[in-house]
């Protein structure tokens, strides 16, 4: 059985755009998670999420692993981008859209063609 930290590392490694949040994109359980989802969704690319309310082990361990105390947490290409305030700020400056599009394009080109 893998440890919680190993599970977190695997989630981050396997999902180029990953949001740790309270609730789900369709039903966020806090305003900060809802704002982060709106900004991410507006970038027009798919992203993965982990509902920390359903994963108390991750909720307990991720702040220590990330050295970031709060949720949501956006991880892009293996790196912590930040929480709600940073995500919104980057979106307002146009930086989030660029980062998300570039990351999505990078990983799309690595996928084998479905045809």
Swiss-Prot record:
Pfam families: Glutaredoxin. Disulfide bonds: none annotated. Belongs to the glutaredoxin family. Monothiol subfamily. SUPFAM superfamilies: Thioredoxin-like. NCBIfam families: Grx4 family monothiol glutaredoxin, PRK10824.1. Monothiol glutaredoxin involved in the biogenesis of iron-sulfur clusters. CDD domains: GRX_PICOT_like. Homodimer. One of its GO terms (cellular component) is iron-sulfur cluster assembly complex. Keywords: 2Fe-2S, Cytoplasm, Iron, Iron-sulfur, Metal-binding, Redox-active center. One of its GO terms (molecular function) is metal ion binding. It comes from Escherichia coli (strain K12). The keyword Iron-sulfur applies. Glutathione binds at residues 22, 59, 71, 84-85. InterPro entries: Glutaredoxin (IPR002109), GRX_PICOT-like (IPR033658), Monothiol_GRX (IPR014434), Monothiol_GRX-rel (IPR004480), Thioredoxin-like_sf (IPR036249). It is found in: Cytoplasm. The gene is grxD. One of its GO terms (biological process) is intracellular iron ion homeostasis. This is Glutaredoxin 4. Residues 5-107 form the Glutaredoxin domain. [2Fe-2S] cluster binds at residue 30. The keyword Isomerase does not apply.
